[in-house]
A protein has these predicted regions:
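Radical SAM enzyme [4Fe-4S]-AdoMet core and its adjacent flexible, acidic
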Residues: 1-54, 60, 94
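Short capping micro-motif at the N-terminus of alpha-helices
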Residues: 55-57, 82-83
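Radical SAM enzyme core and accessory elements
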Residues: 63-139
Length: 139
């Protein structure tokens, strides 16, 4: 994912979930899809054919799940993000430090959710890579 601290990510180095699944199946046998208990979960889970163990894949680049995502992230600095790949942040820390009312906090949350885009746009030539690494965002 293009959220590395050293900004060394390139699409040419992407190892898709499909390729990883194929390698696992070569080594351990067929993987069987597991039923999703939460349609908004980012991982697609599989069971090993022998019934012992599961593995989950989160493939935002090769298999985006943006349409089902209901996640918000808050950074250690109190900045709210509606997507790991977003460059826009909403300052919830300032509201809390200034004694904001519940209505003001709710309004900020609504603005944040309302600004959520339909997709992350990683494959768009105009995509702007976030400056924060994933671990700095809370992912």
């Amino acid at each position: 994912m293009p959220l590395d601290a050293d900004q060394g990510w390139t699409e040419s180095l992407v190892l898709t979930g499909a390729k990883v699944r194929a390698r696992l199946e070569e080594a351990f046998g067929q993987l069987e899809p597991s039923a999703r208990t939460d349609p908004s979960q980012p991982a697609v889970d599989y069971r090993f054919a022998d019934g012992i163990g599961t593995v989950g894949f989160i493939n935002p680049v090769s298999e985006p799940f943006c349409g089902d995502c209901n996640r918000l992230r808050i950074t250690a600095e109190g900045q709210l993000r509606n997507c790991l790949f977003s460059t826009e942040e909403f300052d919830v820390r300032a509201l809390l430090r200034n004694g904001a009312s519940a209505a003001e906090i709710l309004e900020l949350l609504q603005r944040c959710v309302g600004a959520k885009k339909a997709g992350h746009g990683i494959n768009d030539p105009k995509f702007i890579r976030p400056q924060r690494a994933m671990y700095q965002i809370g992912g």
